[in-house]
UniProtKB/Swiss-Prot annotation:
GO biological process terms, semicolon-separated: calcium ion transmembrane transport; intracellular calcium ion homeostasis; mammary gland epithelium development; manganese ion transport; positive regulation of calcium ion import; protein localization to plasma membrane
Gene: Atp2c2
Protein name: Calcium-transporting ATPase type 2C member 2
Extracellular topological domain: 126-127, 251-291, 351-748, 824-835, 894-903
The organism's taxonomic lineage, starting at the top: Eukaryota, Metazoa, Chordata, Craniata, Vertebrata
Residues holding Ca(2+): 330-331, 333, 335, 766, 770
Organism: Rattus norvegicus
Amino acid sequence: MGRRFKFLQKLAFLGQNHRYKALERDEVDTLIDEQYELKAIEREKAVAALPPREACKCSKEELARTFHVDLDSGLSEFAVAQRRLVHGWNEFVTDNTEPVWKKYLDQFRNPLILLLLGSSVVSVLTKEYEDAISIALAVLIVVTVGFIQEYRSEKSLEELTKLVPPECNCLRDGKLRHMLARDLVPGDVVSLSMGDRIPADIRLTEVTDLLVDESSFTGEVEPCSKTDSPLAGGGDLSTLSNVVFMGTLVQCGKGQGVVIGTGEQSQFGEVFKMMRAEETPKTPLQKSMDKLGKQLTVFSFGIIGLLMLVGWVQGKPLLSMFTIGVSLAVAAIPEGLPIVVMVTLVLGVLRMAKKRVIVKKLPIVETLGCCNVICSDKTGTLTANEMTATQLVTSDGFHAEVSGIGYSGEGTVCLLPSKEVIKEFSNVSVGKLVEAGCVANNAVVRKNAVMGQPTEGALVVLAMKMNLGSIKDSYIRKKEIPFSSEQKWMAVRCSLKNEDEEDVYFMKGAFEEVIHHCSTYNNGGIPLPLTPQQKSYCQQEEKKMGSLGLRVLALASGPELGRLTFLGLVGIIDPPRAGVKEAVQALSESDVSVKMVTGDALETALAIGRTIGLCDEKLKAMSGEEVEGMEQDALAARVRQVSVFFRTSPKHKVKIIKALQESGAIVAMTGDGVNDSVALKSADIGIAMGQTGTDVSKEAADMILVDDDFSAIMSAVEEGKGIFYNIKNFVRFQLSTSIAALSLITLSTVCNLPNPLNAMQILWVNIIMDGPPAQSLGVEPVDRDALKRPPRSVKDTILNRALILKILMSAAVILGGTLFIFWREIPENRTSTPRTTTMAFTCFVFFDLFNALSCRSQTKLIFEIGFFRNRMFLYSILGSLLGQLAVIYAPPLQKVFQTENLSALDLLLLTGLASSVFILSELLKLCEKFCSRAKADQMLPEAV
């Protein structure tokens, strides 16, 4: 109190012209507190994220000083609030932060949309308000449908995946709190336990038998042992044993550490930067639509120029001819094209969603239709990522096979070749081998999931299949010598419960290390001396199992290290996912090549490749080292012949994809790890796993397989091919109708004849009539034979030569038939009458409906695809027919459309004539089938 009183006195001093009053004690307290708070705020805001390579060198005390944190009590809420102002939330800022209005406006960047808007403006200027309103409405429908679908797709993705783990255990204000991981800031003290997903980059300060699965980050299958000791130098990220990274998983043990990086300041953030640096290529559909838009633009303006020139030569007013030219240009543009394309893509996405596949961008579905190479990661994609014991060899020569995959415990162990099922110790040698694997084990299997190392989980499940799953409880563990990459084995010293026997060691590990500690081998429960011949036999068995791609573990037991009894070998593998083999076969039959790109060894990769039918006797494999050493051009020349790439890194994967793309391939890449994300972004189609996939891989991908089912890709390819054919069907129908209408009006203008169709009739044909039938073609069910067709070339456009010929043929038939009726009905004085236009108008509409019927398939007859298969098409045709009859016979509509009643004979005549376009199209399909069959029969003897 005395010191504070003297301080107050010093504040009362004389200035030159003023006397300052002494402050009260509470005012001084407030002043001091404010100064202290300002300094505290500055100190907290100055705290920065620490790179892992620097953090790994710090001692615990240096780490605490750097982050201004008490390791025993954690940060205060005040410190957290200040640091969050600088570092933000522990999450990634994704592309989905783009404003909604901007996403909506982006839909207008399509060239067809811009052309339609231009036509609408010109229609307003020329007072063609009906056309302007119709076109504007069509544009709004297009952009709204596209916006809603992409918006819903993004929302579905947000629901499926979170960019950071949702919860964690954090020490704050001296209390351990269970909180959202997004709340973490640099300097937070986080507690980790078995099964936790690491919520941020963390420098460990305490560990107890901590093993972390970093396979999603580094590609290494085996969990990494962690320490809390400072390291001498910061090497590769995978060697930083005292740092754990966001998104990796605690397999066993527990630990505590300080957060050194959050959100985009974590190592995930570095991968995100690489991912965003990769430019996403345009899809083939986007390229085709762009080209079609340009072609239609050139065609439309050419017609305008031609008609204005003809009209000027004939002495007609230029403004009148310009109005006609613009109207014809609008008619020539298939205004339903963007709508049907969008609806077709949306329906494809919805069908795929039912098959548990989320598509982030609509055109990606179609891109799969021309995909001819699928590069797939092995672990977790082609395989189940569930290590499973499949073979046993005992030291005395018994062989057994194990059925059942995964961690459910379902399956049996059978002796070979007798197929005798073994339970417990019905075969002593097998029983002792399985017992050792279960006791020298730290994994726990619950509810079909493993807590701990997957390899150890496989041994526990093996014991469960022999009813020995609880045998570990019969022992009291007294000591453990943990596994290390240097010694390549682990051992436990145990004693039987309630029995006064000497302790026994159980050991498992690499064969060459375990056999080194053995002096005897087990022979039906009796230890015999381990002779060189016996060692050689066991070594041969180990090599034989290894050549099959199995991970081989040797097991032994005995009273002390160095005097152990060798028990035998267990072969473990990550088995293929259900349905993968069938999917690979179906894709291969449709000329889609599946390539495995993995970080595993050659033997393991080949074993899985053979199991799923990926490769044949002419298999070619290439290592990541070879990929790195080759020039890009040389790699592009060889990469198509290689089926398996092994020992690859993320950098190698990107190089492989780019080489495939340079060779002309459309590449789909599947993956689930952080190490796959850059490759997913580089590929034409990136496909991530929904369950085992990391958040970064999902963000990088274009599609997500919700159930991690590789066979769903087969359905996606089928959808992609079917969607493109549906779009071609619609384009054929729409353009043949538009060209026929355009030619009809152009010919009548050039020949100085009266117009066969008036303005309202043209509007009916182009906007109303072409809408429902055309859109129903877009929802035609996917052709069942679509998957069998080879992938479409990326150079192919929607309007290829064959389709153009069919369009021109249909347009010529429609034009010829309508002109025949018009010429038949026109009076001698060549003046237009209501009957003349009604007959020509109805004839054109009937042609339109029959043309739609023939356009349901480019190759199959109507009887093959099924008349009633597409109900929406039938409803649209029926609705259009009823609408046309209403226009002809309803008095109010007769006045609007300037029509008159037609007799039944007139309708029969028009129906018979209009059906010619359908009959001719079906005959053409028959001819094509006959020619294709004859060509195939001719090639068969040559092939033989």
